[in-house]
């Protein structure tokens, strides 16, 4: 017997690519609920965030989870012909907001990003001006600049990111060997650039670093205990670029969760994170 999915699958066309969206049911008893648009980590499917979506719905949010380009329901898979990088991922955020316009008009809307998804969300606000967004939430996000990692970990980050970028350049894509899933060469190129330089890449004549400094949208930034990919130092470094935005910096601890945490497993015990996001949203001005 085939089970009926508890979400509506939708798609947004982006040239040769399309973005898959999981639109979860509206929370019970909350008409015109605030909306969370969730952007995943590199190579992580939207389906992985089902427990987090449930936790967000339980505290009163309408939830839409996107698949990043080339992952999950977003097709096609990356190939040598894929021509997108960070700038296009940021553009996808705006395209999805436009696609959802009839659903979200007049409602508070938050971009919630995990890892690469958080960078894409923040870049969208920086490059688009942020008029469509009331708040940004970064969970287990950082800029992976090798110099800010604790101890000697940064040397491994520098070597690993540049090796992966080199392989992607030679092969025409990153096959996902042990990390990040299959990725377009441009995504890996831009990711490796941030790790090497501590800066967002300049693409199409647009200075993303300067744009980030103009962001005024409120930001909730939550680091997660035992996150070796985005330790708190990398989130602090990223938040340091948000010189014009009100930033609330928090930490999700093992003591609070009552279970093991890392860059990925926090999703399975995310009710406390959802509660923090609800408190943050309650303080935002109504539309």
Which residue ranges define each predicted feature?
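N-terminal cap/lid segment of alpha/beta-hydrolase-fold proteins
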Residues: 1-25
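Active-site glycine-rich loops that stabilize anionic/oxyanionic intermediates
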Residues: 41-44
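Conserved alpha/beta-hydrolase
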Residues: 46-48, 53-78
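Conserved acidic catalytic loop of the alpha/beta-hydrolase fold
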Residues: 90-107
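Alpha/beta-hydrolase-fold enzymes
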Residues: 112-199
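Short beta-strand/loop motif that positions the catalytic acidic residue
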Residues: 215, 221-223
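Short alpha-helix in the alpha/beta-hydrolase fold that links the catalytic acid
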Residues: 231-241
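Catalytic active-site module of serine/aspartate enzymes centered on a nucleophile-bearing elbow/loop
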Residues: 250-287
């Amino acid at each position: 017997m085939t089970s009926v999915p508890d979400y509506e699958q939708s798609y947004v066309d982006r040239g040769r690519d399309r973005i898959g969206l999981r639109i979860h049911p509206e929370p019970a008893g909350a008409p015109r609920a605030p909306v969370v648009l969730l952007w995943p980590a590199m190579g992580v499917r939207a389906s992985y965030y089902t427990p987090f979506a449930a936790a967000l719905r339980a505290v009163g949010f309408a939830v839409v989870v996107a698949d990043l380009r080339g992952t999950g329901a977003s097709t096609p898979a990356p190939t040598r012909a894929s021509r997108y990088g960070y700038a296009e991922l940021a553009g996808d955020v705006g395209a999805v907001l436009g696609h959802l316009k009839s659903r979200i008009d007049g409602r508070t809307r938050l971009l919630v990003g995990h890892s690469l998804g958080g960078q894409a969300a923040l870049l969208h606000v920086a490059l688009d001006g942020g008029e469509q967004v009331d708040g940004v939430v970064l969970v287990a996000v950082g800029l992976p600049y090798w110099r800010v990692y604790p101890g000697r970990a940064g040397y491994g980050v520098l070597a690993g990111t540049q090796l992966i970028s080199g392989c992607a350049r030679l092969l025409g894509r990153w096959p996902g060997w042990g990390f990040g899933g299959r990725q377009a060469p441009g995504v890996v190129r831009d990711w490796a650039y941030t790790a090497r330089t501590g800066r967002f890449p300049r693409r199409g004549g647009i200075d993303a670093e300067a744009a980030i400094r103009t962001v005024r949208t409120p930001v909730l930034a939550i680091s997660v205990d035992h996150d070796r990919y985005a330790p708190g130092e990398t989130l602090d470094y990223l938040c340091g670029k948000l010189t014009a935005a009100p930033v609330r910096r928090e930490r999700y601890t093992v003591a609070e969760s009552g279970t093991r945490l890392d860059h990925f497993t926090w999703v399975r015990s995310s009710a406390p994170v959802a509660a923090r996001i609800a408190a943050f949203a309650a303080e935002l001005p109504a539309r």
